[in-house]
Design a protein with these regions (language model features):
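Active-site acidic short loop of glycosyltransferases
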Residues: 2-3, 31, 55, 80-83, ...
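Hydrophobic helical membrane-anchoring modules
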Residues: 1-5, 10, 16, 20, ...
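A conserved acidic beta->alpha catalytic loop
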Residues: 38-47, 92
């Protein structure tokens, strides 16, 4: 297995962020492999990726019929070759500078390092309704699943590839796929460590406050809660 750090980027209309995120990853991570999975972007994201990838240094998958974060991540996972695998939300490129710290943490007995908003030193600067709902959803996850993790909906992590020998990512859903993965890791007694980060304010406050976006946010929240109970039912079976 290659001694690389494979980072997966899942994109859909990320023209504002993709170039900066790739730049920050390349700036801060040694022995880097970038895998990009694009789901039918129409805002110029594809053209930016193609321009940056003229020398074919990234692995890029273009999907025309799918817009599903979980399946995009799983598809990217199949293209990785590193002994460490990570993921970062494409609009959080400024936090790529934290990956060296996370990679160093993996040199210990820890199997996955997770950036967390809800431990000492972390925080959430988004609009109140999003920050409030996200925090207490994570409290609910911890209470129901009985897993000692405070941020199940983090957008940044890195793990040892060996975890995949015993735990599988289920490729459906939105960010809730990671919730179930963390639960299954805990059941298999893998070691998870959280390190703090502060989530920035929404990039477009006006849009974040709009009714359609809050409706979508509420719907995703419902699906996340549903995933908690599906996870428990799957365990019993």
């Amino acid at each position: 297995m290659s001694s690389k750090n494979s980072i997966i980027l899942c994109t859909h209309n990320e023209a504002k962020h993709i170039e900066k995120t790739i730049f920050e990853l390349e700036k801060h991570i040694k022995d880097l492999e970038i895998v990009i999975v694009d789901d039918s972007s129409t805002d110029g994201t594809i053209e930016i990726i193609q321009r940056l990838n003229q020398n074919n240094k990234y692995k890029v998958i273009y999907r025309k019929k799918s817009r599903n974060l979980a399946s995009a991540f799983v598809r990217g996972l199949t293209e990785t070759s590193g002994d460490k695998i990570g993921w970062i939300d494409t609009n959080m490129g400024e936090l790529a500078s934290r990956f060296p710290e996370m990679i160093d943490e993996l040199k210990s007995d820890k199997d996955l390092i997770l950036m967390s908003r809800y431990i000492k030193g972390g925080g959430d600067d988004r609009i109140f309704i999003r920050a409030f709902c996200s925090k207490y959803f994570n409290v609910l996850c911890k209470l129901i699943l009985r897993v000692p993790i405070k941020d199940f909906t983090s957008s940044i992590f890195i793990m040892k590839r060996k975890v995949l020998d015993e735990v599988t990512f289920l490729g459906y859903g939105h960010g809730d796929f990671f919730l179930e993965f963390l639960y299954n890791m805990h059941q298999k007694e893998f070691k998870i460590k959280e390190i703090p980060y502060i989530q920035k304010k929404d990039d477009e406050i006006s849009n974040s406050k709009s009714a359609p976006n809050l409706i979508k946010f509420s719907w995703l929240g419902f699906l996340y809660i549903l995933r908690i109970f599906v996870t428990l039912i799957r365990k019993k079976n």
